[in-house]
Amino acid sequence: MLAGLKVKKQELANSSDVTLPDRPLSPPLTAPPTMKSAEFFEMLEKMQGIKLEEQRPGPQKNKDDYIPYPSIDEVVEKGGPYPLIILPQFGGYWIEDPENVGTPTSLGSSVYEEEEEDSLSPNTFGYKLECRGEARAYRRHFLGKDHLNFYCTGSSLGNLILSIKCEEAEGMEYLRIILRSKLKTVHERIPLAGLSKLPSVPQIAKAFCDDAVGLKFNPVLYPKASQMIVSYDEHDVNNTFKFGVIYQKARQTLEEELFGNNEESPAFKEFLDLLGDTITLQDFKGFRGGLDVTHGQTGVESVYTTFRDREIMFHVSTKLPFTDGDTQQLQRKRHIGNDIVAIIFQEENTPFVPDMIASNFLHAYIVVQADNPGTETPSYKVSVTAREDVPAFGPPLPSPPVFQKGAEFREFLLTKLTNAENACCKSDKFAKLEDRTRAALLDNLHDELHTHTQVMLGMGPEEDKFENGGHGGFLESFKRAIRVRSHSMETMVGSQRKLHGGNLPGSLSGGIVHNSMEVTKTTFSPPVAAATAKNQSRSPIKRRSGLFPRLHSGSEGQGDSRTRCDSASSTPKTPDGGHSSQEIKSETSSNPSSPEICPNKEKPFIKLKENGRANISRSSSSTSSFSSTAGEGEAMEECDSGSSQPSTTSPFKQEVFAYSPSPSSESPSLGAAATPIIMSRSPTDAKSRNSPRSNLKFRFDKLSHASSSAGH
């Protein structure tokens, strides 16, 4: 296939002697499908041919392979008058012919669209700036008006953004559409006459992109989407320009001679005054065009102007720094050589060749030659040249292309310069850069619109990933596994609660006590008077560090709300096989410490000390004391937080928080209120159920109940 493409390319090269006026016009933006397919295959063949030539070195191109144009030296030797521009020996450029009306210009090209008439100021001479119509179409026709936006993910053409709007003009209804893809942006207005119903969004996209498949559009549901879309559409709209200005003296035909000029003739100064204002670069606040405005390393002065809300900075060769001994004058060429369009000012009749200046960026030149300089009515001849892949641009040159000095010539020149740069951006080299930039920005816009739409719908990124079949890697898989395990545990806990009447075996819940038939709840309610008296002076209590650590610190005299749990003593073995238990108390009803339950509680406490036994609060049955200054609900919260601690923190016991829905028969002071209880399990309970200490604790509890009953 590559060989066939090579042969076809050679045939096209042999027939490349077609003159410039015979070049066909560019097809309209909405060309028939057959023409679109032909253009696509032609572009594909061209790209494959270029890749083949790049991969295969081949012999260098010689002069014998071409029909060369006469060199500039030969033209100069023949004598004048000389043309303003002559083509390079091996071509590659076109020259605008003002006498041939068939010369294509951007006025008849689909690449550009002129600005609307109302955008021109009343003082203009009819010269119109050209720009991409689709770049400003959304702001002009959609922004602030009723319309719909859609985005398409993963089509054969990549991501797509479509805007659609119904409008009426001259008694007819139209459908205005903007379709954005990585390749291009299409803006069209379709009449609805003869259509029974509106076409669907995929049908509209299919009409503009015949080879598109997998079209699945979603509506954009984000209030600020219009601003994001208009920013994307206008990302390549430029309101700042920089142009080079090169001074060419008589019979200068080399690049070194052009950049080596330092003197400015009166005619050249007069022309610079026509272009703009001479400004001082130091601390200049306007568009600087890459010039140094702080340290003065790019000269002292330059020429600057504003034109139709656009800023223009001119890189004048004679005002840029001159370096002695540097024949190439890189300080000057590094600015002018990086411009896209340049002006060549000729004071005398001398030809200019576009390849005279070696640059990868310069694509178009406007040559201005002074006619009758120094007179009261000077005039200027103008000629335009550009590379072959640059589309023609307006305004067209008049015939003859001669202008009198004045505002009209200035406006024509600035308009021509601006349109020239816009046209050069459509050349092959710049178009590739623009395509890559457009594709990256379109993908970013699509992702942002999709994300904001999902947020507006209440779908987070996690749900969105699950909906689209995505996954979040190892971390998301681990989270899902934990959620499944937690759900399984909750299911087991629920089934055991139904089976055992509300409580669970400790083997399932990691420390939950046995059912209520195996537990004896020991509760007490000391007299209110005694509790109030003891509230001011509390006995020192040593707190254990176990499953329920001390969460609050501070002096006991502070009045801030604290949540603690009052734990009762453990009970001996009962016929039901119950274990020791603790009960949550509220200080609003009582605030006792475990050793100070009743007036007679000090005696057994002293006896324990005399017998050399440890404090009850530190006994093996893990009888502990907590004081509470908040309500019962806060005590429950602290117990919940404590129960989340690992059960291995205390090697002597295992405690969990349990909620008793029915009042305990042994707790008359609480009435019908629900009793949250902290259950204590000790590994030594089985060994010490009949121990003297357990019997002593049992007698101590009976004494506490007797005192409580006497109080009532």
Curated annotation (Swiss-Prot):
Domain Rap-GAP per the UniProt entry, residue ranges: 229-445
Feature: compositional bias, Low complexity: 617-629, 660-669
Compositionally biased intervals (Basic and acidic residues): 599-612
Function of the protein: GTPase activator for the nuclear Ras-related regulatory protein RAP-1A (KREV-1), converting it to the putatively inactive GDP-bound state.
Family annotation (Pfam families): Rap-GAP_dimer, Rap_GAP
S-S pairs: none
PTM sites of type Phosphoserine: 26, 488, 495, 525, 539, 545, 593-594
Residue positions, PTM Phosphothreonine: 30
InterPro entries in UniProt: Rap/Ran-GAP_sf (IPR035974), Rap/Ran_GAP_dom (IPR000331), Rap1_Ran_GAP (IPR050989)
Ranges of compositional bias, category Polar residues: 566-594, 641-652, 681-694
A GO biological-process term: negative regulation of neuron projection development
A single MF term (Gene Ontology): GTPase activator activity
Gene3D superfamilies: 6.10.140.210, Rap/Ran-GAP
Cellular component GO terms, alphabetical: cytoplasm; neuron projection
Protein name: Rap1 GTPase-activating protein 2
Gene from which this protein is expressed: Rap1gap2
Localization per Swiss-Prot or TrEMBL: Cytoplasm
Keywords per UniProt: Cytoplasm, GTPase activation, Phosphoprotein
Region listing for Disordered, in residue ranges: 1-33, 529-712
